[in-house]
């Protein structure tokens, strides 16, 4: 499933371009986005309808976004670079890549187009001492997010943090940098690491209202694991509840976003939507007409849960 999510939930409106006071002295936003029934509500009481885009391929390199035909996941891309130019030059490339792929000017442009939110996919290894993007210790995940937070504050954009590549892999494809199976859903060690990293992230950003919320994982469980689908789906909601509980130990303010199984499209794996008062669901739609009927199952699930989708 090799696609780019350029917009999620709502398309850009280019006819309503905002102006920004911005600046480091800005006190925007006044408070946290929260869930209120099927809506997201800002601190001023106004509903928030997400308009935005996705910073894919920055902190989670993906081969198809580079235009590679055979090298697809982060570790394979790094292996290719090391074979071509050696580990030192590969590390130098990644350092410059992270500095230049997304910049303040990009965030400024996105805001000028009428967006109100950006989604930041990231690899869990950015919060470990694993070999990733040229570093084997002192990973810079927090430093990178801190910078995006300040850019978003300056240009009045909310930020969704999306763990696109989870320990063990949640999808079983190239997009999660896994070993070809969603081991996260069967490995206790991976699940504990997953929860620990989210708790560390939540502890750091618990008082940061620029962050709209924490998207626990991207597109869990690829469709082709049919033989294990019941097992994998059955393990998904308990893990999401466990991770949410870990977050709530340190952060009770931010929204937690839960994606459905099978590329964020199947929501029959969820049976309890009352375990937390500030959760929402997130769906991905590939193809189809831009009509309510094309996303009827998502609308029905939203109405059933009375939570934002």
What positions do the PLM features span?
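N-terminal carbohydrate-binding accessory modules
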Residues: 20-115
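Extracellular glycoside hydrolase catalytic/binding regions
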Residues: 32, 186, 192-213, 217-309
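Bacterial N-terminal signal peptides
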Residues: 7-16
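An active-site-proximal structural segment forming one wall of the substrate-binding cleft
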Residues: 28, 33-34, 89-121, 126-128, ...
């Amino acid at each position: 499933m090799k696609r780019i999510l350029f917009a999620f939930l709502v398309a850009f409106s280019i006819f309503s371009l905002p102006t920004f006071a911005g600046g480091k002295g800005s006190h925007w936003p006044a408070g946290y986005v929260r869930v209120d029934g099927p809506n997201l509500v800002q601190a001023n009481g106004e509903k928030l309808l997400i308009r935005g885009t996705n910073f894919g391929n920055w902190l989670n390199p993906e081969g198809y976004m580079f235009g590679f035909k055979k090298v697809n996941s982060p570790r394979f891309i790094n292996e290719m670079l090391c074979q071509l130019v050696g580990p030192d030059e590969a590390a130098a490339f990644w350092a410059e890549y992270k500095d230049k792929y997304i910049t303040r000017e990009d965030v400024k442009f996105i805001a000028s187009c009428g967006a109100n939110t950006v989604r930041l996919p990231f690899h869990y290894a950015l919060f470990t001492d694993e070999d990733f993007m040229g570093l084997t210790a002192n990973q810079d995940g927090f430093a990178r997010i801190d910078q995006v937070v300040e850019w978003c504050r300056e240009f009045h954009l909310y930020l969704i943090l999306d763990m696109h590549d989870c320990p063990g892999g949640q999808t079983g494809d190239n997009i999660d940098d896994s070993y070809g199976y969603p081991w996260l859903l069967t490995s206790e060690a991976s699940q504990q690491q997953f929860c620990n990293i989210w708790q560390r992230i939540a502890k750091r950003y618990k008082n940061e209202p620029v962050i709209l919320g924490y998207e626990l994982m991207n597109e869990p469980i690829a469709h082709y694991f049919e033989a294990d689908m019941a097992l994998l789906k059955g393990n998904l909601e308990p893990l999401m509840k466990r991770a949410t509980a870990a977050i709530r130990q340190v952060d009770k303010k931010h929204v937690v976003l839960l994606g459905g199984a099978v590329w964020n499209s199947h929501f029959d794996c969820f049976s309890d939507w009352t375990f937390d008062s500030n959760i929402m669901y997130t769906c991905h739609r590939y193809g189809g007409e831009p009509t309510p009927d094309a996303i009827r199952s998502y609308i029905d699930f939203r109405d059933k849960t009375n939570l934002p989708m």
